[in-house]
């Protein structure tokens, strides 16, 4: 059978919090089958757990948060969640000694390296996928996102940014998902923001960890980072990275075709909740062997040794 995945060993890293600008220690721990993805704040006494759950997601100006019933939150979970989706990690406990996951370089790549360093272990329990059975679409003004039935996982994302630094030909990106494709094509794409917004937020004591080290920063005319872009279409690739993380908030890889126009964290989450709320639109599936499994979810050689 196709088995659930966790880590082989505990790994730790440090980074900076986007909100506070302070050092954060991140610890990734293996977890037993059927645990799911658990985010844990160890700076609170007792520690507080936040299971990945579409209904717990709140989208703020700066990041995605998980919020519990007592209005306690953990922030900036989206890029790590994308890395978990990319590598198909089903069970993990993610600890931080702060209210937020460190921003690292603004992409998912540092988290991918950390997960690969931990090693990935197959558990003796069937991996459950969410398979889309009916088309589900959500809209917000001219923005929209939808899932259609498809035996695999494809993403097609279009942005519409009127900015001199973003060429009109680099505003759409489409891909057939796989762990290899995610690592090569998506994981290194960084978040982005306007210099004036960062300066304004920092003047109000917010976004204190925001810098050229963790984002693409633009003014009204150009990219300000000395090293420029990692991809010509890095902006739309990062929006796809965000979507991959947002859609994994149900804790399961999804079998279907995702298409979006000008979508963001809030609309991606609205789509996921709309799918899950419509019982006839999806089903849980497991697979006995690789021959049945959609190509999108075959484990690459770098993942399962």
Curated annotation (Swiss-Prot):
It is an enzyme of class 3 (hydrolase). Its cofactor is Zn(2+). Keywords: Hydrolase, Lipid A biosynthesis, Lipid biosynthesis, Lipid metabolism, Metal-binding, Zinc. It catalyses: a UDP-3-O-[(3R)-3-hydroxyacyl]-N-acetyl-alpha-D-glucosamine + H2O = a UDP-3-O-[(3R)-3-hydroxyacyl]-alpha-D-glucosamine + acetate. SUPFAM superfamilies: Ribosomal protein S5 domain 2-like. The keyword Lipid biosynthesis applies. The keyword Zinc applies. The active site is at 265 (proton donor). Zn(2+) binds at residues 79, 238, 242. Its EC number is 3.5.1.108. One of its GO terms (biological process) is lipid A biosynthetic process. GO terms for cellular component: membrane. It holds the Pfam family LpxC. Belongs to the LpxC family. Catalyzes the hydrolysis of UDP-3-O-myristoyl-N-acetylglucosamine to form UDP-3-O-myristoylglucosamine and acetate, the committed step in lipid A biosynthesis. PANTHER family: UDP-3-O-ACYL-N-ACETYLGLUCOSAMINE DEACETYLASE 1, MITOCHONDRIAL-RELATED. This is UDP-3-O-acyl-N-acetylglucosamine deacetylase. It comes from Salmonella typhi. The gene is lpxC.
């Amino acid at each position: 059978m196709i088995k659930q995945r966790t880590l082989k060993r505990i790994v730790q890293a440090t980074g900076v919090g986007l909100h506070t600008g302070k050092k954060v220690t991140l610890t990734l721990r293996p977890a037993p089958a059927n645990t799911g993805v658990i985010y844990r704040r160890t700076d609170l006494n007792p520690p507080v757990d936040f299971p990945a759950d579409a209904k717990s997601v709140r989208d703020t100006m700066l990041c995605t948060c998980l919020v519990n019933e007592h209005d306690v939150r953990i922030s900036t979970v989206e890029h790590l969640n994308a890395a978990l989706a990319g590598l198909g990690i089903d069970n993990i406990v993610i600890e931080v000694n702060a209210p937020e996951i460190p921003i690292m370089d603004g992409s998912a790549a540092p988290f991918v390296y950390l997960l690969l360093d931990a090693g990935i272990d197959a558990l003796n329990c069937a991996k459950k996928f969410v398979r889309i059975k009916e088309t589900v679409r959500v809209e917000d003004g001219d923005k929209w996102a939808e899932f259609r039935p498809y035996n695999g996982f494809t993403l097609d994302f279009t942005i519409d940014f009127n900015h001199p630094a973003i060429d009109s030909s680099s505003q759409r990106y489409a891909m057939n998902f796989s762990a290899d494709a995610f690592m090569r094509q998506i994981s290194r794409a960084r978040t982005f923001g306007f210099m004036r917004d960062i300066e304004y937020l920092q003047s109000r004591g917010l976004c204190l960890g925001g810098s050229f080290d963790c984002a693409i920063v633009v003014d009204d005319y150009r990219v300000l980072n000395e090293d420029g872009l990692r991809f010509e279409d890095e902006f739309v690739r990062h929006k796809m990275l965000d979507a991959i993380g947002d859609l994994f908030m149900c804790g399961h890889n999804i079998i279907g075709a995702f298409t979006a126009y000008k979508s963001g964290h809030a609309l991606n989450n609205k789509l996921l909740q709309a799918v899950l709320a419509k019982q006839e639109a999806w089903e849980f599936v497991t697979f006995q062997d690789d021959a049945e499994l959609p190509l999108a979810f075959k484990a690459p050689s770098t993942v399962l040794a």
